[in-house]
């Protein structure tokens, strides 16, 4: 069945594209949710008239993605994690943790757009994480996982500081 997309779809096409999809996918998902319309003469004419505004909207999205990329490329996130004596982390870092930290910095990035090459980060070190922004535009942010100081270390440090103050 041929349909005209009303939104961009990652593996299907862009807004305004006429694509061939299976009947069930169109009837049960795309059409009821309003993501597409039937491809008939009337709808094709409507989308041909809207083509200019669709292209302008795509250019705007691309420009916003490029601006965001230039800002995100400068971001370095630091996580302080607890570990056992052998150095193994108690918790791993996933895309949700990264999205929350980016939100604290003012970047509202969907979790599904964050691509951790290894799935989750489970060891100390510095990692490159890809953030997909738009078609062909992605930013790379640095994520560093450091060892969190133990309570005992903090207490001994506070005692040393108190002795220096006296």
UniProtKB/Swiss-Prot annotation:
InterPro entries: Ribosomal_bL9, Ribosomal_bL9/RNase_H1_N, Ribosomal_bL9_bac/chp, Ribosomal_bL9_C, Ribosomal_bL9_C_sf, Ribosomal_bL9_N, Ribosomal_bL9_N_sf. It comes from the Bacteria. Keywords: Ribonucleoprotein, Ribosomal protein, RNA-binding, rRNA-binding. Binds to the 23S rRNA. It comes from Borrelia garinii subsp. bavariensis (strain ATCC BAA-2496 / DSM 23469 / PBi). GO terms for biological process: translation. One of its GO terms (molecular function) is rRNA binding. Belongs to the bacterial ribosomal protein bL9 family. The gene is rplI. HAMAP family: Ribosomal_bL9. Pfam families: Ribosomal_L9_C, Ribosomal_L9_N. GO terms for cellular component: ribonucleoprotein complex; ribosome. The keyword Lipid biosynthesis does not apply. The keyword rRNA-binding applies. This is Large ribosomal subunit protein bL9.
């Amino acid at each position: 069945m041929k349909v005209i997309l009303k939104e961009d779809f990652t593996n299907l096409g862009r807004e305004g594209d006429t694509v061939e999809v299976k009947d069930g996918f169109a009837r049960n998902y795309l059409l009821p949710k309003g993501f597409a319309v039937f491809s008939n003469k009337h709808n094709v004419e409507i989308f041909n008239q809207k083509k200019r505004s669709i292209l302008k909207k795509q250019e705007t999205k691309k420009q916003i993605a490029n601006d965001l990329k230039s800002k995100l490329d400068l971001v370095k996130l630091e996580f302080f994690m607890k570990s056992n004596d052998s150095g193994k982390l108690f918790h791993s870092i996933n895309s949700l943790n990264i999205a929350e930290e980016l939100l604290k910095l003012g970047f509202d990035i969907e979790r599904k757009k964050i691509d951790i090459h290894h799935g989750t980060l489970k060891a100390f070190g510095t990692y490159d994480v890809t953030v997909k922004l738009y078609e062909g535009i992605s930013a790379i942010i640095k994520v560093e996982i450091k060892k969190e100081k133990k309570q005992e270390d903090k207490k001994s440090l506070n005692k040393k500081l108190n002795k220096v103050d006296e």
